[in-house]
Every structure is written in structure tokens, then in C-alpha cells.
Amino acid sequence: MKNLFIYATLLLALAACQNETKNQSNNSTQNNMEQTTEKSAIEKLLFSYRDALNASDVNKVLPLYTSEGVFMPSNAPSAVGQEQVKASYEFVFSQIQLNIEFYIDEIVVNGDYAFARTISKGTTLIHANGQTVAEENRELFVLQKTNGQWKISRYMFNKMK
């Protein structure tokens, strides 16, 4: 009788462990699926940003930023908030025309915040002299999910060459 009780207890403990492992596996799978969905949404945002840059379209850039977004261009002052960000991009687009592609190195999501590291490569047409030059930058995006949408909260880049 004593042995039967021990076997029954062991069997119950084993079943409980298997159930816990199954729950952990299900939670892990669900988290992976959520991460994949979030990363896909961020990729879409980054490629929309690339398209807006290539079109030199301030009106397509601005909605991609949060209301308090910060643009930190290389060799220029930081722009904070929609008005300054708009003025910065208007100036940039008056000076150059980009033709670039983005290559995503890394996206890390943590709740409603994420960061992305990218490299952009292509060409830049300088309006002042009509010259086209090679363009290659590395970028860091800090992203924030607001109202269910990923947006650029902070963005900075520097030239690689």
C-alpha cells in the first residue's frame, strides 16, 4: 500500500512537471510570434522612412516620428519635436536628393520601445553643383509604440566613409 502511494505521488509530480514544461513552451512560442509581428511592423516603418527619404517628402517623413521625436543628423544640430524635425528635413531636402537602400542589422523589441541598427547605401545628388556622390551611413533608431503604431522616437546617423 505504501509503495502504491509513492508511485501515485511520483506519477502526479511527473505529470505536473510535464504540464509546466508544455505551458512554458506555449508561452515561448507565443512570445516568439509576438516578437516576429513587432519586428515586421518595425521593418515596414523603416522601409516607409527610406521611401520618404528617397522621395524627399517631408509630409511622408513627419507621420513616422512621435510628436516629441528627435532627429540627430551628422554635423548638424538636433531637431526636437515636429516643428524642428520638419524644418530640418525641409532644409536637407532642399540641399540633396537621396537614392538609398536600407539594410537592417538588428531589431530589438522590449515592450513599447525598440531599437534598430541599419546601414544605408546609395547615392546623393547635391543640388548646389549637380554632382552625384556615394552615400553610406550607419543609423540608430529608437522606436516607440504609440496608439498601436511603431514610430521613430530618436534617430541618428553618421557617415561610414
Can you annotate each of these PLM segments?
Residues 6-10:
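Hydrophobic helical h-region of N-terminal Sec-dependent signal peptides
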Residues 70-80, 92-95:
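A short gly/proline-enriched turn/hairpin at secondary-structure junctions
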Residues 49, 61-62, 69, 81, ...:
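Hydrophobic pocket/interface hotspot
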Residues 14-16:
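C-terminal motif of bacterial Sec signal peptides marking the signal peptidase cleavage site
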Residues 1-5, 18:
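Positively charged n-region of N-terminal signal peptides that target proteins for export
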Residues 18-67:
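Short, low-complexity N-terminal intrinsically disordered segments enriched in polar/charged residues
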Residues 90-128:
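Surface-exposed, charged secondary-structure patches
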Residues 22-23, 136-161:
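Short beta-strand edge/turn micro-motifs at domain boundaries
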